[in-house]
């Protein structure tokens, strides 16, 4: 049977649902159950603290526990706040898919997620995130709709930064923000799906934003992030993207950046081997 493989579908197998793998955000879908994935990501850009290139590298491991639960663990190495590379942060992420309405070549899914992060950096700006800059917790909701070759996904979450500066009076920084994203993905190639060995070319556009909830002087940022993605033999993907700021009133550490990442999945890595 000939059918289209959606652009954002990675790691497809004969018995698992497709995933919409946006480079800058998570979909509501999970990776295949009982599988493990290894990922290396890099962010490169011109920071505001120096003339060199700021860099952050993120090795990450992901586990598909079952069809509803998946967990991530990651650390970051960076020179963004110092003039040398150092171990910067660690974080854990868990996602629970609580709704699935699946049909032929389309589905609607929703998931809840939570993140906890520790960072060695101290608060220096009011762009709140848990990607290496800050220590804190985050919780949110994801909704993803798939139609054949096109996917649309939205995320909303609350970040609470846990930093010793919270005790300073008067307040010097924001500590709570509403973060959101709107992501789209589309399959460019192949036009006709034949087998799992075909290389897929996917194109994405993502809107990424944050609104500080407890700070009146620097309130928001809004970024756009177009990207391209290649999927090889349904088991690995290479993503390249550029994130830039159309509008913001926040003094940020980095306004524009390049992203490159490579990920490989080990299907059925967590399944128990049957004894003979």
PLM regions with names:
Residues 18-61, 117-123:
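Short glycine/proline- and aromatic-enriched beta-strand/turn motifs that initiate or cap beta-hairpins
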Residues 26-33, 68, 84, 100-109, ...:
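Short loop/turn motifs that connect adjacent beta-strands in outer-membrane beta-barrel proteins
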Residues 32, 53-57, 85-90, 131-137, ...:
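Residues that define the transmembrane beta-barrel architecture of outer-membrane proteins
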Residues 38-42, 73, 94, 110-114, ...:
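Membrane-embedded beta-strand positions of outer-membrane beta-barrel proteins
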Residues 42-46, 75-81, 98, 114-120, ...:
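Transmembrane beta-strands of outer-membrane beta-barrel pores
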Residues 62-64, 95-101, 142-148, 183-191, ...:
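Structural signature of outer-membrane beta-barrel channels/translocons
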Residues 83-177:
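Outer-membrane pore/translocation modules
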Residues 91-94, 182, 254-276:
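Outer-membrane beta-barrel "beta-signal"
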């Amino acid at each position: 049977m000939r059918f289209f493989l959606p652009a954002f579908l990675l790691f497809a197998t004969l018995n698992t649902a497709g995933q919409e793998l946006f480079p800058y955000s998570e979909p509501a879908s999970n990776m295949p159950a009982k599988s493990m994935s290894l990922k290396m990501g890099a962010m490169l850009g011109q920071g505001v603290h120096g003339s060199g290139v700021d860099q952050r590298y993120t090795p990450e491991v992901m586990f598909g526990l079952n069809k509803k639960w998946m967990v991530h663990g990651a650390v970051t190495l960076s020179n963004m706040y110092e003039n040398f590379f150092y171990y910067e942060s660690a974080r854990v992420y868990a996602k629970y898919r609580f709704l699935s309405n699946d049909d032929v070549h389309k589905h609607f899914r929703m998931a809840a997620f939570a993140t906890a992060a520790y960072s060695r950096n101290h608060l220096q700006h009011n762009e709140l995130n848990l990607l290496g800059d800050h220590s804190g917790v985050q919780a949110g909701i994801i909704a993803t709709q798939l139609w054949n070759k096109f996917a649309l996904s939205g995320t909303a979450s609350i970040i609470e930064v846990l930093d010793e500066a919270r005790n300073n009076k008067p307040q010097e920084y924001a500590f709570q923000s509403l973060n959101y994203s709107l992501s789209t993905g589309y399959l460019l190639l192949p036009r006709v799906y034949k087998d799992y060995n075909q290389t897929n070319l996917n194109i994405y556009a993502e809107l990424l934003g944050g609104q500080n909830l407890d700070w009146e002087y620097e309130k928001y940022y809004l970024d756009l992030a177009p990207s391209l993605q290649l999927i090889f033999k349904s088991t690995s993907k290479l993503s390249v993207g550029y994130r830039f700021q159309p509008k913001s009133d926040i003094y940020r550490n980095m306004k524009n950046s390049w992203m490159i990442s490579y990920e490989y999945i080990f299907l059925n890595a967590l399944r128990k081997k049957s004894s003979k």
